[in-house]
Amino acid sequence: MADNKAPQGLLGLLQYTPTTQPYPRVTPPSNRRPSTTPNSQDRGRPRRSDKDSRKHLYADGLTDGEDPEVPEVEDEEKENQRP
């Protein structure tokens, strides 16, 4: 007669699998911290063309190629009149 601890056949193999996992436990994706790669949030957006990347914002808020609307001639004249 067969042992009760190790039954025979395919059903026995299924029941007798060891409970300890032979590989380290993998953390589920919900516990992983979100990726900080810069591309992760920009997927699906078209790439900037070279023309857009060359246009660059200055400190006064004007982009490259725009003329300032307020002429600064008065300030230069005042500076030149100082002794």
Curated annotation (Swiss-Prot):
An example Gene Ontology biological process? symbiont-mediated arrest of host cell cycle during G2/M transition
Query: Which UniProt keywords are present, listed alphabetically?
Result: Early protein, Host cytoplasm, Host G2/M cell cycle arrest by virus, Host nucleus, Host-virus interaction, Modulation of host cell cycle by virus, Phosphoprotein
Compositionally biased intervals (Low complexity): 28-40
Basic and acidic residues bias located where?
Answer: 42-58
Q: What does this protein do?
A: Contributes to multiple aspects of the viral life cycle including viral genome amplification, suppression of suprabasal cell differentiation and egress of newly formed virions. Induces host cell cycle arrest at the G2 phase by associating with and preventing the nuclear entry of host CDK1/cyclin B1 complexes. Inhibits cellular DNA replication by preventing loading of host replication licensing proteins MCM2 and MCM7 onto chromatin. Within the cytoplasm, associates with host kinase SRPK1, a splicing factor regulator, and inhibits its activity.
Naturally occurring in which organism (per UniProt): Human papillomavirus type 1 (Human papillomavirus type 1a)
A Gene Ontology term for the protein's cellular component: host cell nucleus
Domain of life, source organism? Viruses
Full protein name: Protein E4
Q: Where in the cell is it found?
A: Host cytoplasm; Host nucleus
Leftover remarks: The major E4 form is first synthesized as an E1^E4 fusion protein from spliced E1^E4 transcripts, such that the first few amino acids of the E4 protein are derived from the N terminus of E1.
How it assembles, according to the record, is: Assembles into oligomeric complexes. Interacts with host CDK1. Interacts with host SRPK1; this interaction may favor expression of late viral transcripts. Interacts with host cytokeratin components KRT8 and KRT18.
> What does its PTM field state?
Phosphorylated by host ERK. The phosphorylation triggers a structural change that enhances keratin binding and protein stability.
Primary location recorded for the protein, binned into one broad class: host cell
> Key word DNA-binding present in the record?
no
Q: Per the similarity annotation, which family is this?
A: Belongs to the papillomaviridae E4 protein family.
